Every structure is written in structure tokens, then in C-alpha cells.
């Protein structure tokens, strides 16, 4: 027997024409955590960051998430529709955000911020990477509350019948993503940053971890209706995750190789 989906009104409350939604609140929670955690990290001795720099980057980062997420969704998942309806890019009221697009937006923000502040791109990336997973966790919970991005049909005991997913029970894949891409990845990064690490390695762990978790969970997530599976076996989410896996692994190997070479020179 399938579990009953806990139907929650996506709108928390409304004041006149203004509605406050759970999904928007989740974005706010993710941003608030990032601000708190970043300031906490910046306050540590020799962090190389000031409170003002944290605030400046978070502004750039927020723009990167929003603009990159929206542009990425339109280009990756709705490209054909966008070609016929270019103004769809600005129809944010119709929803649609891509984490992979948001990642590209944040990477762009990292590069711009590092260049304008005369900081190392790798060090900025390492500082930013641990801020992301809690935002992912909150965002996926928002997806679950909205009853969207559900999983494939399943008979597991915890499968649910989603309001927009037809009569069959499905994997609550949003919760899988919240757990692995959010909580587990956050804990991995917290363990990893307890010790000094080579420049670029923290960002590498994030890219590798997220890409791997997302690639695997895509097997439980319903493919996008307008795209389906490419070659009948791989989803768009998996295609976009592969560069993250390869890039993260490559960055990790390069970072530790550089650290080893520096140690050998000093020795």
C-alpha cells in the first residue's frame, strides 16, 4: 500500500495580491544559512575573508543562482519551446529552475568576484562550496511540498501517489535528493574542511559528490516529459551531471598533485 502524500498548500499566506510560498521560503532559508555559515567561516583566524566580502559575494552568488538557474532550465529543458517563445525566459511565474544552470551561475560569480577582489578562484570556490548543500536540501523539500519533480513508478513501501503524478505510486525522489545532495553532502564537506586541504579540493569534493548523487538518483526520478531519455537510457540530469563528476575528480587529482609537488620542493 502506498503512503498518502501529505498535501500542503504551497502558499503559506497571502496579503492582497502578494502570496508567500513555501518554495520561496526554502530559497530564503538556504540563503540565510549560507550567510550565517559564511560569516562563521570568515571569522576564523587567517580565513582571508571579511564580513563585507562575504556580503558582497553572497549578492553575486544569489544573482548567479537565480539567473543561471532560470537560463539553464530554459536552455536545458525547454529549448524548443524557448525558440518559438523567447519571452518564456522571463515567465518566472510559470516556474522552472535548473540546479546545473545555477551552478554555472555561481561559478561565474566566483570567477568575477575572485577577479575583482584579487583572490584565487580556487580559494573562493573552496569557501563557497560548503554553503551550497543546505540550500539544495531546502529547495528539494520545497519541490516535495509543491508535489513536483516526483519519481518513477514504484512498489516500495514508502512510494507515494502524487497529486499531479497520476494514480500510480512513485518514488519520493525529491526526498532522496534532499537527503543525499543536501544532508549527506553537507556532512561530507564538514568532515573534509576540518583539516587544511589543497586549494581547489573542497570545490572538487562538492562537484564530484553532487554529480555522483544526482546521477544515481536520476534512476529513481521521472524523466522530464518533454525530453524523456536520450538513447533510451540516460536523462538530461545525468548528462549534465557527468561534467561535474569528471571535473570534480579532475580538480581533486590536480589539487593533491600540486600540493605533493610543493611539498617535494620544500623538502
Swiss-Prot record:
UniProt keyword terms in alphabetical order: Cell inner membrane, Cell membrane, Membrane, Transferase, Transmembrane, Transmembrane helix
Highest taxon in the source lineage: Bacteria
Subcellular localization: Cell inner membrane
Gene Ontology cellular-component annotations: plasma membrane
Pathway membership, UniProt: Protein modification; lipoprotein biosynthesis (diacylglyceryl transfer)
GO biological process: lipoprotein biosynthetic process
Entry's EC annotation: 2.5.1.145
Matching Pfam families: LGT
Binding residue positions for a 1,2-diacyl-sn-glycero-3-phospho-(1'-sn-glycerol): 140
Membrane topology type: Multi-pass membrane protein
TM regions (residue ranges): 18-38, 57-77, 95-115, 173-193, 200-220, 233-253
MF (Gene Ontology): phosphatidylglycerol-prolipoprotein diacylglyceryl transferase activity
InterPro entries linked to this entry: Lgt
Main location: membrane
PANTHER family (UniProt xref): PHOSPHATIDYLGLYCEROL--PROLIPOPROTEIN DIACYLGLYCERYL TRANSFERASE, PROLIPOPROTEIN DIACYLGLYCERYL TRANSFERASE
Functional note: Catalyzes the transfer of the diacylglyceryl group from phosphatidylglycerol to the sulfhydryl group of the N-terminal cysteine of a prolipoprotein, the first step in the formation of mature lipoproteins.
Family that this chain belongs to: Belongs to the Lgt family.
The protein, known as: Phosphatidylglycerol--prolipoprotein diacylglyceryl transferase
Naturally occurring in which organism (per UniProt): Pseudoalteromonas translucida (strain TAC 125)
Amino acid at each position: 500500500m502506498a503512503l498518502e502524500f501529505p498535501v500542503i498548500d504551497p502558499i503559506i499566506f497571502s496579503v492582497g495580491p502578494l502570496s508567500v510560498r513555501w518554495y520561496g521560503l526554502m530559497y530564503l532559508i538556504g540563503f540565510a544559512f549560507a550567510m550565517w555559515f559564511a560569516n562563521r567561516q570568515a571569522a576564523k583566524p587567517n580565513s582571508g575573508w571579511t564580513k563585507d566580502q562575504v556580503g558582497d559575494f553572497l549578492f553575486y552568488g544569489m544573482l548567479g543562482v537565480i539567473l543561471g538557474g532560470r537560463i539553464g532550465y530554459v536552455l536545458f529543458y525547454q529549448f524548443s519551446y524557448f525558440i518559438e517563445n523567447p519571452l518564456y525566459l522571463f515567465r518566472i511565474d510559470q516556474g522552472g529552475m535548473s540546479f546545473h544552470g545555477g551552478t554555472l551561475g555561481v561559478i561565474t560569480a566566483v570567477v568575477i568576484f575572485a577577479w575583482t577582489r584579487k583572490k584565487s578562484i580556487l580559494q573562493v570556490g573552496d569557501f563557497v562550496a560548503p554553503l551550497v548543500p543546505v540550500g539544495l536540501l531546502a529547495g528539494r523539500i520545497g519541490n516535495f511540498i509543491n508535489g513536483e519533480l516526483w519519481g518513477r513508478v514504484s512498489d516500495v513501501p514508502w512510494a507515494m501517489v502524487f497529486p499531479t503524478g497520476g494514480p500510480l505510486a512513485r518514488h519520493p525522489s525529491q526526498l532522496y535528493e534532499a537527503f543525499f545532495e543536501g544532508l549527506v553532502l553537507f556532512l561530507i564537506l564538514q568532515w573534509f574542511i576540518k583539516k587544511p586541504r589543497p586549494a581547489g579540493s573542497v570545490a572538487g569534493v562538492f562537484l564530484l559528490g553532487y554529480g555522483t548523487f544526482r546521477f544515481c538518483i536520476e534512476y529513481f526520478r521521472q524523466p522530464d516529459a518533454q525530453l524523456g531519455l536520450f538513447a533510451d537510457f540516460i536523462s538530461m540530469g545525468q548528462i549534465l551531471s557527468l561534467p561535474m563528476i569528471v571535473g570534480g575528480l579532475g580538480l581533486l587529482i590536480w589539487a593533491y598533485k600540486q600540493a605533493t609537488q610543493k611539498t617535494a620542493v620544500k623538502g
